[in-house]
Amino acid sequence: MEVKRLKVTELRSELQRRGLDSRGLKVDLAQRLQEALDAEMLEDEAGGGGAGPGGACKAEPRPVAASGGGPGGDEEEDEEEEEEDEEALLEDEDEEPPPAQALGQAAQPPPEPPEAAAMEAAAEPDASEKPAEATAGSGGVNGGEEQGLGKREEDEPEERSGDETPGSEVPGDKAAEEQGDDQDSEKSKPAGSDGERRGVKRQRDEKDEHGRAYYEFREEAYHSRSKSPLPPEEEAKDEEEDQTLVNLDTYTSDLHFQVSKDRYGGQPLFSEKFPTLWSGARSTYGVTKGKVCFEAKVTQNLPMKEGCTEVSLLRVGWSVDFSRPQLGEDEFSYGFDGRGLKAENGQFEEFGQTFGENDVIGCFANFETEEVELSFSKNGEDLGVAFWISKDSLADRALLPHVLCKNCVVELNFGQKEEPFFPPPEEFVFIHAVPVEERVRTAVPPKTIEECEVILMVGLPGSGKTQWALKYAKENPEKRYNVLGAETVLNQMRMKGLEEPEMDPKSRDLLVQQASQCLSKLVQIASRTKRNFILDQCNVYNSGQRRKLLLFKTFSRKVVVVVPNEEDWKKRLELRKEVEGDDVPESIMLEMKANFSLPEKCDYMDEVTYGELEKEEAQPIVTKYKEEARKLLPPSEKRTNRRNNRNKRNRQNRSRGQGYVGGQRRGYDNRAYGQQYWGQPGNRGGYRNFYDRYRGDYDRFYGRDYEYNRYRDYYRQYNRDWQSYYYHHPQDRDRYYRNYYGYQGYR
């Protein structure tokens, strides 16, 4: 096993198999594994060659790529190893230490082959993390999420390459992972007499909470090794549809809501991966008068992973255009929840009955009374009026059918069916039967994806990116921007109800982690959807900016940089901490500062603007942040080792490439090096004196002539035996000649 050629994930897998600590940077892991292999070798020799704990785990040597002689290959190698260190750092912060074993007992290797273990470790970088346990079942009207989350869902890794693009920026000085029991109490040390820098230790918080910025940084590191993003899938061509039909609107629906082909139903796209995620859609038409109804049926509860405590729920009702996608959690948004609750503007009250799989809910809107009345029915049974809406406050806004579901499949009847699930009350008509001129159509999506635009936010945590994005989207309603950010996804993952008990730290941390993972998938879906988007993330790394914007190849791509002055930024960070209850880890903040650079207009950035301070004012602040962070981040010893190894490799390449000049081999004495290396008086003796010192011993042992007569009789006897064998076994001789002499070799 060549330890130096193993990747971080492979090193971790081998260490875990032996019950050893798998935390640390690559150089530490390699040293730890090499010591374990040496110990096993000594045990084998002492015990007569018995197999040790790692005896059966001989990894196949990985092919060594030809090292380029130019600077580009060196930069890519640096970036690859630095990114492995970055991933190792992030994994260490989440990794639980292995269970302590009895003294003197060896760890039992798993039954699976080492190749499979290495592949599994490489495919799942977070495999060492332990899932959070759910603390309670699904009892109560608020479902199972209020007491705790289900099993942890690991993000499906994408195929990644081992190197980064030359144009991307990778952290220059990575902090070394500190080991030992005293890591929580030891603090940064000031520079001593030898001039060493003050270091900020990377360590796991005792609260096991990280916050949005940490997991956003983690996702960025997870995807940062792709040379270039996969090209977006070709969008299916829209067939000519009857624009007078009432069906689900794919332009305003959630990206993670999978609308059926006939657009009269749908289901969540990530129900198995993210079971806490709500998703839904509105209809293409709304109404402002008359007595109108529609039906919604829960056709199926989607299966969930074993141990998941989440429940399947449907919320159905009415909402106005431009309201939030979470039905019942915004003004002029009214929903009836499967837990027997009604919701309006985020306020929940008990109403009607609970409902679930195979139940049909009728939704009725009566505009002919003094106030607009919204009522519901279950399987044809009237449940009464749930909401009364003032016509003055509603004004001329139209009410649109709206569904929101979690882990279930919903089917809608707007009147397109020949027969309804249940007959509606007298004088009520399905919305599809309302004349087209009396309906209100929602916005029509762009005809081509070239008409769409994407805005990439760039800035440190707490700089005000989200506020800028929400304000800009509100000021430009005709664009209908979809703001994709961790906070947006978190709102769609939180369960609201009559009571909202606080989640335990582990469950809250897991929810934030899942939101970051879900956001990465939504960005990929957005790149092939005809809408306008604002990517509300930090995006301080050039590699992350490039990777995301290249996904939106046919969009109009803009970048907005938000850099406030230092005083405002500190105030916003404090306010962010008060509102969200978490702080940005210092090590993550330093990494972001050290690698924050202002983007420039290029082939994948059509426009770069500044949301607060202009570039001339922002540049000195960013430069100051970089310098301060790099002073606090400890230097990486690994970087120095790599540079020395690279110089050694370059010397070897030069000697191979310049070994022959003019058809004659150049000797050591002809090398273009200083005379001090070739044994001049007063110097170290050099290579030539060292070589001559042992030349005599070499010649005495290896320089002897071969004595043929001494071994002639020995070989002659074996030759007779083989001839006799082939004489009595001609079939073997023929097979031997065919296999050996029949092969013609390379031509």
Curated annotation (Swiss-Prot):
Residues bearing PTM Omega-N-methylarginine: R656, R684, R738, R747
Compositionally skewed regions (Low complexity) per UniProt: 115-125
Compositionally biased region (Gly residues): 137-147
Positions of post-translational Phosphoserine modification: S161, S168, S185, S188, S226, S228
Subcellular locations according to the entry: Nucleus
Sections of the chain in a coiled coil: none
Biological process terms in GO annotation: alternative mRNA splicing, via spliceosome
Gene Ontology MF terms in the entry: RNA binding
Principal subcellular localization: nucleus
Ranges annotated as biased composition (Acidic residues): 73-97, 232-242
Compositionally skewed regions (Basic and acidic residues) per UniProt: 148-163, 185-223, 627-639
InterPro entries reported for this sequence: B30.2/SPRY (IPR001870), B30.2/SPRY_sf (IPR043136), ConA-like_dom_sf (IPR013320), P-loop_NTPase (IPR027417), SAP_dom (IPR003034), SAP_dom_sf (IPR036361), SPRY_dom (IPR003877), SPRY_hnRNP_U (IPR035778)
CDD domains recorded: SPRY_hnRNP (cd12884)
SUPFAM superfamilies, per database record: Concanavalin A-like lectins/glucanases, P-loop containing nucleoside triphosphate hydrolases, SAP domain
Composition bias, Basic residues: 640-654
Residue ranges of domain B30.2/SPRY in the record: 226-419
Keyword set, alphabetical order: Methylation, Nucleus, Phosphoprotein
Sequence positions bearing Phosphothreonine: T165
Domain SAP positions: 3-37
Keyword Nucleus: yes
Gene Ontology cellular component terms for the protein in this record: membrane; nucleoplasm; nucleus; synapse
Subunit structure: Binds to MLF1 and retains it in the nucleus.
The name this protein goes by in its record: Heterogeneous nuclear ribonucleoprotein U-like protein 2
